[in-house]
Amino acid sequence: MKPLSSPLQQHWQTVVERLPEILAEATLSVQAKSVLTFSDFVQDSVIAHPEWLTELESAPPQADEWRHYAAWLQDALAQVTDEAALMRELRVFRRRIMVRIAWAQALSLVEEENILQQLSHLAETLIVAARDWLYDACCREWGTPCNHDGVPQPLLILGMGKLGGGELNFSSDIDLIFAWPEHGSTRGGRRELDNAQFFTRMGQRLIKVLDQPTMDGFVYRVDMRLRPFGDSGPLVLSFAALEDYYQEQGRDWERYAMVKARIMGAADSAYVDELRAMLRPFVFRRYIDFSVIQSLRNMKGMIAREVRRRGLKDNIKLGAGGIREIEFIVQVFQLIRGGREPSLQSRSLLPTLSAIDALHLLPENDAGQLRAAYLFLRRLENLLQSINDEQTQTLPGDELNRARLAWGMRTDDWSQLTDILAAHMANVRRVFNELIGDDETDTQEDTLSEHWRELWQDALQEDDTTPVLAHLSDDDRGRVLALIADFRKELDKRTIGPRGRQVLDHLMPHLLSDVCSREDASVPLSRITPLLVGIVTRTTYLELLSEFPGALKHLISLCAASPMVASQLARYPLLLDELLDPNTLYQPTATDAYRDELRQYLLRVPEDDEEQQLEALRQFKQTQLLRIAAADIAGTLPVMKVSDHLTWLAEAIIDAVVQQAWGQMVARYGQPTHLAERTGRGFAVVGYGKLGGWELGYSSDLDLIFLHDCPMDVMTDGEREIDGRQFYLRLAQRIMHLFSTRTSSGILYEVDARLRPSGAAGMLVTSAEAFADYQKNEAWTWEHQALVRARVVYGDPQLTSQFDAVRRDIMTLAREGKTLQTEVREMREKMRAHLGNKHRDRFDIKADEGGITDIEFITQYLVLRYAHEKPKLTRWSDNVRILELLAQNDIMDEQEAHALTLAYTTLRDELHHLALQELPGHVAQECFSKERALVRASWQKWLVAG
């Protein structure tokens, strides 16, 4: 065993002062002193449980002791009679065994492969024991879940990721998926429960038993987001539902994740075999599947962006040449060839790497180098985490922990350790790049004219710039030179390291060459230089633009086209990553895929880290806005589609925010008890205005109201129980908070909830019954107008149907035509007087006479006026389709409806483009005279004439 270094010997004196008398220094072995000096986690544990140290000294950890975990735990649980005792015993057992594993690892008593095996088997043992205890308890309480033939149904648990692969790290969360075989109901209980209800309740209790922090800590952080549909999907799925999902909707990244899936505690049974057989075709294709290379390349890009966004340095998992790249190398062969090569179907990395070597799929010696690097990195990761039982892969910056790791890795000092580490990671990066590569070719040697270099370095006299800027006018040439000079002055105020200056000096001649070839050179340059000022101290982003010429070209063209895009990029430099791939930059996410994209995006963020979750939501929104704007600028999205995409994006974010708020509220208070006998959450979010009408713009806020269906006198079922209606109020308040909290990426959306019953004076969340009563008995005509453009954007089907029925009933009320006409017209006149165009020589596209709002009022008036005769008019909430309905139902002449639709979309298109130019929504008075005349004529016809 390697002696302790000088810093560690000094630290030992600090350790001695903490030890109780029962652990006197004189009685401790050299091994004990070494481990206690190395690991604060072990130190804290044996101070709390001195008998564990005695056990370690008398019966040191063995390589095969994982075989005894189940029996040891069974003995510990023998006297457990309630969940509180179960939670306590599981936590104490986990800590005791983790101390033994940390001891064995620090002293190199067992091989690193065996450490991974012990960590994984411990987790599986704890999960299975908790599941089995709870299954028996739930069966006693509710009866045994059976299929229609009376055969008992088990809960099967898929361990994903490193848990499934038998490669769990020391301090890790666990990714699980719950499933049960067949539908049916419970038998033998006090009352019958559907199997879905039984397993959902049991799953919730299992997560609580494993995940909830107590005075004894927790067993494992449980992450359920890899299940079908993520947080928005059922907690537990039947085999049939699983099969349908993976056959019809399974994504490449889910296939990638499923490679390592393993059934926890799987004994031989028909159900276990059935689940394995069902999942295998999804993971391993029968044909050689080279499409996976692009999918993995995309994932690699996501990781690189994540490293940049989070500013990760010295990260041995996600950094270049780290653990994740070794996993990618192995899994690319599994996913490409696994369907034809059974030896590649192992869940564990090292056996699969051996199979890859045996099949000669990698050049000679590469597999051996990858194996050595993997074992080195995994040992370093586990030692790092065992210092304080902390989930980290970032190398320490302090002297003590560096000395600890140097000792644990059996190197002389930190310098030697980092040299060996760098060599391993360089080997991994080389193999990774050769196998997966990049879409972009390496940057070509700089062949720019010396003029561009001199222009950047201010080595040209003004007269000398004529050859390179000859196509520009004298004024524009002067503006370009002034912009470059101002930019250099700004840089002088910044602290830029040698590497940053080097990258900038390489980038700027390229940028100037591309920008100055344009006739409008000063326009993009004036918009790009503020962005560069913002990122000069963040070398990774400068390198991105320097190393990827395509990204630089996209930056120039987008900034030239839109100051809004330039401002977004300057405020949020992380968006620069989106410039790397034109396939995604100019192709927005499919309208029905935003929820899934966001779910995948959020999987990278710890579920319990609210700050990171908030930041990720905002980053996702900014990324998607950039893609939509890029497609808009490129002319590939018409105005209707721009709004569709912006609306679907908002709905996906609303869904995620509700999920997050719901999880936080349930963790604090439990669920309202009226949900026990049903699925869903008894909650709905209704979108009004532009959101309800599928007409969002780039900077639109969200008009929302919140509904629930909670009866009176219902309480929540948590330890801190509160009134059910109070729960929904706090849920709505939490949702508002998540939307409005300002992070480094800004707020999510401005949310206006004043359209709720009684406006700002009313309750933030309303029961469905109270909402219906208010609409029937108290609401003003303008509130009924608003209802025309309202729809549920998140909610249970039952509550959605209730809202739709109320909306339909209100809109189909018989109204006296003249009275309605007067009320709608007077409301519009009040709005015009209140908002008043302050630019008398300009036309306000939205608010002025003949503008967008007039068209909206015409459609709302006609729906309220005629829906009692033509109920089909209530079907849609957007103006364009309402105009179609008015023509189809012979309320409005088809030619007039078409002309109003064209005027409406033309005016909205102009608003979108003004937003891209960061210009206000008004134009010269002579603009759109034809459209305005047409709208005024319709207004006169419907809302003025008798």
Swiss-Prot record:
Its EC number is 2.7.7.89, 2.7.7.42. Residues 449-946 are annotated as: Adenylyl transferase. GO terms for molecular function: [glutamate-ammonia-ligase] adenylyltransferase activity; [glutamine synthetase]-adenylyl-L-tyrosine phosphorylase activity; ATP binding; magnesium ion binding. Pfam families: GlnD_UR_UTase, GlnE. CDD domains: NT_GlnE_GlnD_like (cd05401). Belongs to the GlnE family. Involved in the regulation of glutamine synthetase GlnA, a key enzyme in the process to assimilate ammonia. When cellular nitrogen levels are high, the C-terminal adenylyl transferase (AT) inactivates GlnA by covalent transfer of an adenylyl group from ATP to specific tyrosine residue of GlnA, thus reducing its activity. Conversely, when nitrogen levels are low, the N-terminal adenylyl removase (AR) activates GlnA by removing the adenylyl group by phosphorolysis, increasing its activity. This is Bifunctional glutamine synthetase adenylyltransferase/adenylyl-removing enzyme. The gene is glnE.
